[in-house]
Amino acid sequence: MSLVEKNTASEDAFALSEATARDYLVLLKPRVMSLVVFTGLVGLVLAPGHMNPVLAVISILCIAVGAGASGALNMWYDADIDAVMKRTRKRPIPAGIIAPNQVLAFGLTLSAFSVMTLGLMVNWLAAALLAFTIFFYAVIYTMWLKRSTPQNIVIGGAAGAFPPMIGWAAATGEITWDSLVLFMIIFLWTPPHFWALSLFTTNDYEAARIPMMPNVKGELSTRRQALFYAVLMAPVGVLPWVMGFAGMFYGVVSTLLGLAFVYYAWRLWAADSQPQMLAAARKLFRFSLLYLAGIFAVLLFEALTFKLLAAFGVF
């Protein structure tokens, strides 16, 4: 073994000895994972029919582990730009806590475990969707789109939109128009959400040479496109009620939240000064989180209520 190899091995051993369970948890991107698990749960509960509770828990755990695996693989590949950006430079790899090869092995192991477990215990359609989601996020988005096009978020947003479809497929073994609508809500929500974020973190993305929309097309174009996607998303958000797999309460809430989303996006587009624009971007970003959490929470509440009433013979 050469001196360089010995030094590398000793550095890896040091990194491993310093790493804690919390550091490995950070690799899983728990905040992102929580949203993925939540939307996956909604898809599973909203799906027609009854699923064995044990299999339902296994499905959600597999979705969570698969999401975490995607996060770990993303951090492995993006370690160079994470070291440059202020909000990511303390992640385990750039901070020197965990060696890159260990993160790669961790991510690949979790990926294989989550997909195989979901396939063997639940069904292979859900497993195939989970495998494709991991591949799409880790390879298509992280390794290709993120560094090559300002449309990275638009196309790459598909990865974050699959969880409710996976939950639905786990419960039914099918892909239906209903599950595709859930996919489209998140898919159309993603661009204005992340473009609002990028407007007040422009310097970070520029330093890392990531071609986010504000850095490539300019702030005005970004604001215009954020409004465009908000206008597209608002009516799609009401479709679960229109199509009959959500109730009137959801219809009212999704309509009001959708109109509010468009309003905040319009405020961003109409801002006529830099301070106003930055303030509007932060407000849109925060409200976008409330919007997605709100409509999926109502979907979950209605689905659980209807199934509980059905169990007692009310319906």
Curated annotation (Swiss-Prot):
GO terms for biological process: heme O biosynthetic process. It catalyses: heme b + (2E,6E)-farnesyl diphosphate + H2O = Fe(II)-heme o + diphosphate. Pathway: Porphyrin-containing compound metabolism; heme O biosynthesis; heme O from protoheme: step 1/1. CDD domains: PT_UbiA_Cox10. PROSITE patterns: UBIA (PS00943). It holds the Pfam family UbiA. It is a multi-pass membrane protein. Its main location: membrane. Its EC number is 2.5.1.141. InterPro entries: Protohaem_IX_farnesylTrfase, UbiA_prenyltransferase, UbiA_prenylTrfase_CS, UbiA_sf. The keyword Transport does not apply. Keywords: Cell inner membrane, Cell membrane, Heme biosynthesis, Membrane, Transferase, Transmembrane, Transmembrane helix. One of its GO terms (cellular component) is plasma membrane. It is found in: Cell inner membrane. The chain crosses the membrane at residues 32-52, 53-73, 93-113, 120-140, 153-173, 180-200, 226-246, 249-269, 295-315. The keyword Transmembrane helix applies. It comes from the Bacteria. GO terms for molecular function: protoheme IX farnesyltransferase activity. PANTHER family: 4-HYDROXYBENZOATE SOLANESYLTRANSFERASE (PTHR43448:SF7), PROTOHEME IX FARNESYLTRANSFERASE, MITOCHONDRIAL (PTHR43448). Converts heme B (protoheme IX) to heme O by substitution of the vinyl group on carbon 2 of heme B porphyrin ring with a hydroxyethyl farnesyl side group. Belongs to the UbiA prenyltransferase family. Protoheme IX farnesyltransferase subfamily. Carbon 2 of the heme B porphyrin ring is defined according to the Fischer nomenclature. This is Protoheme IX farnesyltransferase. It comes from Brucella canis (strain ATCC 23365 / NCTC 10854 / RM-666). The lineage of its organism: Bacteria, Pseudomonadati, Pseudomonadota, Alphaproteobacteria, Hyphomicrobiales. The gene is ctaB.
